[in-house]
Amino acid sequence: MNSFYSHLAGATVRWFDFQGQGDPIVFIHGLGCASSYDYPPVVSNPILNGRRALLIDLPGYGYSDKPLQFGYRIADQAAVVVEWLNKLQVSRCILYGHSMGGSVAIEAAQRLGKRVESLIVAEPNLYAGGGFYSCKIAGQTEDDFIANGYQSMLAEETSPGKGCLQNSAPWALWRGATSLVVGASPSWFERFIHLQCRKTLIYGSLSLPSQEAEDVETAGIALAVIPQAGHSMAWENPAALARVIAGLL
């Protein structure tokens, strides 16, 4: 595992660098998750033909530091991603973001401009309002969530993702969830459809139908579907996700 000190976050950010050929695929995880947990089974699949992959744990999550003073908004996380890629001197990349990470990837792609060869977002938050998970968190005050809601959420969680959740700072979860509920202006949907790089939306078959997916297809952007998977597609069908990503390179 690698690390660098983020001046924007005021903390150390950690990531995996799976060495390989070609422009790297940058994996950005969702709320309460960690790329170090979600994506090794995906990037190690032989179908990706040894493509270099960078798996970042955003500030507040996974192995990265969890500073109390950081904002954790989508824009804040996108700025750290760009700072990190600048530090690595990455001149061209493919951005992949899941859920909250999809929104982060969209904002990062705007900042990176022509350095982004392709943007792949998997069930991202494209509009204000959040989803079930983020609304449940943001429906509490930050103090209440830190004091009580976070532990209640941990107690209720039974999926393998509980390990990621318990390695997520409650203040990062609350501020990230609140940012998703508040949304952005212009919306992430508007930003996504107007980006000039190649773009693809990924959905798990069990998550369809979806209004957001229909809106993106109507805008002329390709939709790829992961069979036998829902929102947590990297856990549910990593081989199929690897195949879809490989087909987009």
Task: Name what the model sees in each region.
Residues 32, 37-39, 64-70, 130-133, ...:
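Conserved catalytic-core motifs of eukaryotic protein kinase domains, centered on the activation segment
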Residues 9-63:
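Conserved HGGG/HGGXW glycine-rich cap/lid loop of the alpha/beta-hydrolase fold
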Residues 235-247:
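Post-His helix in hydrolase/transferase enzymes
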Residues 103-111, 115-148:
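Flexible "cap/lid" loop of the alpha/beta hydrolase fold
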Residues 170-229, 234:
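Conserved serine/cysteine hydrolase catalytic core
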Residues 54-96, 243:
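Active-site loop/oxyanion-hole signature of alpha/beta-hydrolase fold enzymes
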Residues 130-197:
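Conserved alpha/beta-hydrolase catalytic His-Asp/Glu region
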Residues 29, 93, 97-102:
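Conserved alpha/beta-hydrolase "nucleophile elbow" surrounding the catalytic nucleophile
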